[in-house]
Amino acid sequence: MPPGVEGQDILRACWAGTAAFTAVAVVTTVFPDPMAVPMAVASLGLLAAGCAAMLWAFQQALERSRYELIGVGGLYFLAGCAPRSVRLSMMAALALESAVALAAASVRPFTASAFGILVPVYALGLSGAWGARHGTFPPRPPEGTTPADVDPNRNGDHV
């Protein structure tokens, strides 16, 4: 976890969920029948938490978008709005969740391991929550003006 950055609580929650899912997925792959319910519950719980985080992030971004230029790539993938260490940490959690989900579902198709495919929504939702709460975005130009130095594709890459 990157030291000295804002949003440590979100980073810790993201990695805790990723670690819990990884542990449950590994055990479910080895013991598919007794772990079917825990795998489904863990996967659906992380999906629900990720969806809630995504909706909260979207609502916060709507409020901030009155004054700042916020893009989807910046909000959910932290492109240009977060320090590199935060972006790498959150995207590493997303990549790990995706890899574990695909591996578990590939090894044990047609079992509860397939529920794991839903889990990457968790890391993506928490990335959005971090971006909405702590992300730095360029200011929105005054109404009716389009200055040449405002590039909406820049999306805060000055961070």
Feature roles, as predicted:
Residues 103-135:
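Hydrophobic alpha-helical transmembrane segments and immediately flanking/interface helices
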Residues 2-49, 90-93, 98-106:
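Long, highly hydrophobic alpha-helical transmembrane signal-anchor segments
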Residues 70-96:
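Short membrane-interface loop/juxtamembrane segments of multi-pass integral membrane proteins
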Residues 31-35, 60-67, 107, 111, ...:
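Juxtamembrane transmembrane-helix termini
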Residues 48-58, 123-131:
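Hydrophobic core segments of alpha-helical transmembrane domains
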Residues 1-5, 66-75:
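Hydrophobic, membrane-facing alpha-helical anchors
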Residues 52-72:
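Membrane-water interface of transmembrane alpha-helices
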Residues 1-22, 132-159:
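Cytosolic-side membrane-entry/anchor segment at the start of a transmembrane helix
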